[in-house]
Amino acid sequence: MLDTLERNDSTGSAANAEHFDVLIAGAGISGIGSAYHLQQQCSGKSYVVLDMKDTFGGTWETHKYPGVRSDSDLYTFGYRFKPWVGAPIASADEILKYMGEVIEENAIGPNIRYGHRITACKWSSADNRWTVEAIRLADGSKATFTCNFLWMCQGYYDHEKPYTPDWEGVSDYKGLFVHAQLWDPRTDYAGKRILVIGSGATAATVVPAFAEKAAHVTMLQRSPTYFFCSENKNELADRLREIGIDEPTIHRVVRAQIMHDQDVMTKRCQTEPEVVFEELKELVRLFTGKPDFEFAPHFTPKYRVWQQRLAFCPEGDVFRAAVEGKVSVVTDEIDRFTEKGVRTASGEEIEADIIVAATGFRLSVMGDIPFSVDGKAVNWNDTVTYRGMMFTGVPNMAWVMGYFRASWTLRVDMMGDFVCNLLNHMDKMGAKRVDVQLRPEDQGMPLSPWIEADNFNPGYLMRGLDKLPKRGDKPEWRHNQDYWAEKDQIPATDLTGAEFKYS
């Protein structure tokens, strides 16, 4: 059983607050991984994990649309400490099973409080602690916690309010209109005409899944996306199993292989994007068996490969469905919704029984929770990030922000090491507080938005840059997207450096 702790008091007042050394916000892939590292590396510290849902899983529990699966391989998306045994691309149910095993095997469950929505985080310099206010969703009562260190692992997008453009005429449409993020799994779509708006990772997942039962699926995209087609297996892992190698060794070796290949791929996308695109097209031809497969205009993006995430396409399923006539693609702008469907800018009307918006999500910085330091509200856009983990002017807090191109969880493990090293260092010093601060040589450093648009520019980030902290022009003051650089830099961090201020 994954038991939760129960609180004795019901007033929710600060006087009755429960105190923990560390409070972890979120019981998704980041929060569970962080809890594991805290238990292993800071075994004497008390902690609690708060999550608004009634179970663990985060994204993988929230998303219910057909075919929901990872868009990263599970050898690298899985934790480094627990081997992944299975196909590289996994379903949400398989990922939840994996996470549940981590919770059970490491007795994390008793430290998780489900059904708690955090409403405020307040730092007091007088007390050197955070006060975290929450609401118990079961009955609406208030709960208050205090902690020495706050570890934000709640992800970076809004699970309840996805991004939906303000299309004209939506209310005129007589069929079912829903955002993929809010899909009800009880919906019967067999034999229906389905229109999917979007072309990113979500569309790449739902389109072939819908095509299995729907009468027909149309994917309407404003602009094309790059797809990476591959078999859903890892030959090296399969071969090592055949010769009797143990799973921990397989996990370690295959992770290293995949991370190396991803690093090479990322660099090639920057130095020879045209060559990489030709290779991606060749994979489509291979999986469809169509050497004359036509890529223009629907599968020829206008941006460079890897400026946005590649949409993974196991077994070429999207393209095979298109070749089989189950799926059609339209590249156009939406003029307006009509009673029967959507009219495009070019005048074509696409009729559908169900319209699914796969238009991305809305960025949520720190869960959109109000933060304050000594009574002053925190505006994250006024802060400068330390390696995408900590922030100037905000003491005793870390935020897990993973990689965009590589698997998110690689950074969860790395940050777990960093935060635990920091906490242990503070204990040795007898410090109660740590701030990150610009060093003398950083004064006057030019500050820029969180990430360069020329480097990585998905819509959700571009729409939310004004909510995110600033970055500097030095490695310490930016969220580096290069795992291979960070895997050496972050473990070698000098915690006595001038960028850290202890008291």
Question: Regions from the language model: what does each represent?
Answer:
Residues 203, 226-229, 248, 384-385, ...:
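C-terminal, flexible cofactor-proximal segment of oxidoreductases
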Residues 71-73, 365, 391, 454:
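A short, structural micro-pattern
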Residues 70, 79, 167, 299, ...:
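Short clusters of hydrophobic/aromatic residues that line enzyme substrate/ligand-binding pockets
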Residues 260-271, 303-307, 438-442:
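Charged, low-complexity surface segments at secondary-structure and domain boundaries
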Residues 2-27, 33-54, 59, 91-195, ...:
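Flavin (primarily FAD) cofactor-binding/catalytic cores of flavoenzymes
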Residues 77-84, 262, 299-304, 396-401, ...:
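Short glycine/proline-rich turn/loop motifs
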Residues 52, 57-101, 224-282, 286, ...:
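Glycine-rich active-site loop/strand segments that organize a redox cofactor
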